[in-house]
From Swiss-Prot:
Protein task: Subunit of the V1 complex of vacuolar(H+)-ATPase (V-ATPase), a multisubunit enzyme composed of a peripheral complex (V1) that hydrolyzes ATP and a membrane integral complex (V0) that translocates protons. V-ATPase is responsible for acidifying and maintaining the pH of intracellular compartments and in some cell types, is targeted to the plasma membrane, where it is responsible for acidifying the extracellular environment.
One of the Pfam families matching this protein, by short name: ATP-synt_F
SUPFAM superfamilies: AtpF-like
This protein's name: V-type proton ATPase subunit F
Membrane spanning residue stretches: none
Family to which this protein belongs: Belongs to the V-ATPase F subunit family.
Gene Ontology terms, MF aspect: proton-transporting ATPase activity, rotational mechanism
GO cellular component: proton-transporting V-type ATPase, V1 domain
PANTHER family associated with the record: V-TYPE PROTON ATPASE SUBUNIT F (PTHR13861:SF2), VACUOLAR ATP SYNTHASE SUBUNIT F (PTHR13861)
Family matches, as NCBIfam families: V_ATP_synt_F
Keywords in alphabetical order: Hydrogen ion transport, Ion transport, Transport
Entries under InterPro entries matching the protein: ATPase_V1-cplx_f_g_su, ATPase_V1-cplx_fsu_euk, ATPase_V1_fsu_sf
Gene: VHA14
Entry keyword Transmembrane: no
Amino acid sequence: MALHAAVKGKLISVIGDEDTCVGFLLGGIGEINKNRHPNFMVVDKNTPVSEIEECFKRFVKRDDIDIILINQNVAELVRHVIDAHTAPVPSVLEIPSKDHPYDASKDSILRRAKGMFNPEDLVR
């Protein structure tokens, strides 16, 4: 009889407004780790910037998270912390919210990724 070890996948985390978080939670991404820490944070107009920064830093340090989704308007509040994160994992993706459309010109991660490729290499 062979024993099979169950391999658990990595998580997606979300930092965003209530609608964004609820949407992703309904999609099944909600998890609480062994220390009872969730993989999401709901941000509203009363959330202190320091709390958002600490949450982002916690998500970056967690070894069970591979992707951090963050509303772009929230990312603007903690841009210096996001820009300081240079490791490929967890990947940080800025997403639109219901009230704030995505603006590629504000996405520093996208600009950094574009700088990694030579446009001439993509044509071939």
